Amino acid sequence: KDLYSEADFNKMKAEALFLRTFFYNELVVHYGDVPLMLTSAKMGDGYDKKIRTPRAEVVSQMLEDIDFAIKWLPNIAYTDGHAVQGSAVVLKCRILLNDQRYSDVAKLAGDYIHDPNNPFDLADDYAGIFFGKQENNPEIMFSIQFKAPDDFHALDQMVGSRMTIFPSFNLRASYEPNDPRIKMTMYEIGDPWPNNEKSGLFEEDGNKAEGLIPFTQLAFKKYVNPNVAVPKASTLSDQHIVKMRYADLLLMYAEAMFESGQGNDPLALKALNDVRQRPGVNMPVKPQLTREIIRNERRVELAYEGIRYYDIIRWDIAKDVIPTVQYDELSLIHISEPTRPISI
């Protein structure tokens, strides 16, 4: 500590607390009460037998930590994998939303969005957020970064060729007609498909390279690098995995304003319509906010980004949406059936 200035030391501490809060938020959403560990674990000190801490106490610690992070992280654009102030603001909004603290989210998100020093903005290329234009992208607020061939993942192989997860019919049906995000999110029959060695198209019998059939006749395009050959995809994938982006913050703000009784505020509607009206998407503006509109916009805008699961939990709609998930227009998926993971 003596080797650094107060600002430098607290910035490093803020990054560490941001990450601890990030992972505890994942645990709390999944498990509720979890063991809260605030000191380094050592062999023989019984850390493996630590009892679960009440959820409310864990959340209180998370909010204390993230407030420290917001104070000491720099308010600059996100570039190099290090959390910045905007990253911490998004994380705090997510924590507060999980507890239905809508007024607090509306205030926090609104203050940041409308701050003239806010360094973030919507990207002018929706598809580029996930492949091709990730470096210094103004919309990305936090991501897991990779650089092949030394630091890589296998997403192109597992999603782009083997299709270990694919879109449901319900997800496809949730898009409005002519929404260009459809083609930027998923492959449909007849689309160019690099893994079909015969026709080069995505066809009804699916992936010719691996011989696996997508039941929905859909496959995800987000994060897929069309230039990586299937045999090499396990070692060349280095797309950054986006965990937070500005569109999510805008939609959280719109939702929080609506749920806190401020849905008639023009700024709330503008936040949602800004997402819909980004260059390259240009979907018609919505004349007013409704719960259905907000929730569906989150579903399509953030599809296959790991957000929908948490939205289903905090909205308490699993009992409504899970039993109705469909492979296609006719076939319901029964929960007891062994199946490939499917994104709803």
Region annotations inferred by a language model:
Residues 1-156, 180-336, 340:
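Acidic/polar-rich alpha-helix caps and helix-coil junctions
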